[in-house]
């Protein structure tokens, strides 16, 4: 079978084909390799693979790990087909992490590692590797390497299962999928081998290639969950990524939550802490009292303000003001109270002849009049008629002063607010957020916290993905 010229995918490399002609010793793979003249320009290839090396390939602790990690996943292989050889990685002196004396590239690792899923919890791929064909070329799908068969000359060294397993625990960062080249399952389907033999049908290869392309997309989404950086955050409330095919971010609890107390991060304390903290500090009206301080004039020990006389002795506020205004000491004996105007003997109103009133006034002639007659004349310039006279003195309940009214209203408002906050949780609390998020099924879930960082939106939702209520203690009032 001949490959169409519009699919220049592969080139023959002597290190992979044991320096022999591909047609004579590898008849089953001859149609999968193209001449270098049909490949992409070297500049574009170098830029693309440098992009993968800078973002996708992790760094390793020893050369054995590096050897185990060179085989590439279907997600990257889809850009060039089913089988691929990278000569600039095989014989590049500028890569110190590869052993120069060994062609240390594994075609048969026990696990299939993808640079897009650098995770200690990554799954076993759908295409198992065949470690029994050391002479075959490098294969992106390890299962296809077993059918290559053939020579066993300077074969590529294969790793033991222990080394292959240890490759999954390497440190690395999940890469960003390359956007320069987008894989097309329809055009690259024929290049993927569907069976170990070379006579496999192209239609069958395209069918399997479509399945592999979908699998590579689903596996490439598992970028964040099982990174070795994530298990360090496990004590903060996250679960292992093995239970969730599509992982979520761990809960974020700032260190300042333990420093400033639970009031700032309590669900009911969004506005500043527990309900008791809403009450402002009222100015203490108790009189200041110091030990051993006494007014030298009246002997008082409690006063709103302590003053001093000319000699430096302490005076209470009343005695100090009196001394300041009058220049003499405040008399200790209160003066006799003057008789009230209502009790003046022989005084009666010149208009209504009443003898009881709250306040005596005088008319225009200077005669004493009661309070009612005096006000009436002052307002109407007419004497008050006798028909309006009443035996009793009508009094009224005076309204409270505005200051006391405001203070009482403020205290009542704060008490009501504190009661409401105790009975019901704050509308900005984590419980309320969970209530709003629960009926919305297509939104990403919160992972043990109502925290601000959103979780990645799942493309393929799984039944094992749990929508848990956020823990109220880790709610960050981020309105800040």
Curated annotation (Swiss-Prot):
Where in the sequence does UniProt note compositional bias of the Low complexity kind?
183-201
- Sorted UniProt keywords: Activator, DNA-binding, Isopeptide bond, Metal-binding, Methylation, Nucleus, Phagocytosis, Phosphoprotein, Repeat, Transcription, Transcription regulation, Ubl conjugation, Zinc, Zinc-finger
Q: Where is the stretch described as Disordered?
A: 166-208, 457-480
Top-level taxonomic group: Eukaryota
UniProt keyword annotation of Nucleus present:
yes
CDD domains recorded: ZnF_GATA
Q: Please state the residue ranges covered by GATA-type zinc fingers.
A: 295-319, 349-373
Modified sites of kind Asymmetric dimethylarginine:
86
Single biological process term from Gene Ontology: cell differentiation in hindbrain
Protein name from the UniProt record: Endothelial transcription factor GATA-2
Q: What gene is it encoded by?
A: Gata2
């Amino acid at each position: 079978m001949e490959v169409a010229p519009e699919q220049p995918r592969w080139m023959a490399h002597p290190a992979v084909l044991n320096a022999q002609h591909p047609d004579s010793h590898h008849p089953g793979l001859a149609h999968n390799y193209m001449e270098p003249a049909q490949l992409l320009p070297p500049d574009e290839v170098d830029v693309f693979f440098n992009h993968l090396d800078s973002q996708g390939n992790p760094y390793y602790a020893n050369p054995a790990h590096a050897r185990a990690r060179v085989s590439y996943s279907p997600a990257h292989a889809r850009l060039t087909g089913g089988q691929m050889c990278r000569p600039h990685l095989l014989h590049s002196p500028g890569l110190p992490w590869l052993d120069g004396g060994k062609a240390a590239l594994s075609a048969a690792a026990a696990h299939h590692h993808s640079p897009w899923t650098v995770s200690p919890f990554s799954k076993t791929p759908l295409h198992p590797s065949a470690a029994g064909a050391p002479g075959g070329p490098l294969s992106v799908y390890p299962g296809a390497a077993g059918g290559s068969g053939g020579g066993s000359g300077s074969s590529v060294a294969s790793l033991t299962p222990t080394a292959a397993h240890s490759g999954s625990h390497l440190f690395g960062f999940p890469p960003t999928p390359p956007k320069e080249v987008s894989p097309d399952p329809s055009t690259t389907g024929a290049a993927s081998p569907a069976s170990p033999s070379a006579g496999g049908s192209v239609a069958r290869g395209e069918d399997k290639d479509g399945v592999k392309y979908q699998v590579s997309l689903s596996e490439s989404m598992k970028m964040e969950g099982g990174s070795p950086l994530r298990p360090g955050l496990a004590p903060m409330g996250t679960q292992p990524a093995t239970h969730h095919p599509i992982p979520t971010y761990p809960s974020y609890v700032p260190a300042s939550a333990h420093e400033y107390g639970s009031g700032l991060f309590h669900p009911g304390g969004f506005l500043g802490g527990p309900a008791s903290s809403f009450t402002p500090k009222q100015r203490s009206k108790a009189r200041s009292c110091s030990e051993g301080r006494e007014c030298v004039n009246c002997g008082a020990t409690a006063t709103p303000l302590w003053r001093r006389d000319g000699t430096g002795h302490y005076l209470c506020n009343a005695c100090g003001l009196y001394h300041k205004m009058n220049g003499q000491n405040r008399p200790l004996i209160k003066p006799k109270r003057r008789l009230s105007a209502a009790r003046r003997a022989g005084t009666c109103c010149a208009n209504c002849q009443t003898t009881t009133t709250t306040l005596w006034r005088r008319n225009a002639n200077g005669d004493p009049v009661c309070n009612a007659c005096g006000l009436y004349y002052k307002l109407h310039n007419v004497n008050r008629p006798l028909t309006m006279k009443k035996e009793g003195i009508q009094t009224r309940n005076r309204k409270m002063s505005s200051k006391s009214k405001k203070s009482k209203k403020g205290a009542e408002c704060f008490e009501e607010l504190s009661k409401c906050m105790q009975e019901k949780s704050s509308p900005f609390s984590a419980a309320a957020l969970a209530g709003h998020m629960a009926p919305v099924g297509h939104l990403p879930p919160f992972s043990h916290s109502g925290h601000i960082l959103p979780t990645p939106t799942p493309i393929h939702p799984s039944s094992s993905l749990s929508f848990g209520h956020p823990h109220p203690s880790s709610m960050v009032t981020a309105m800040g």
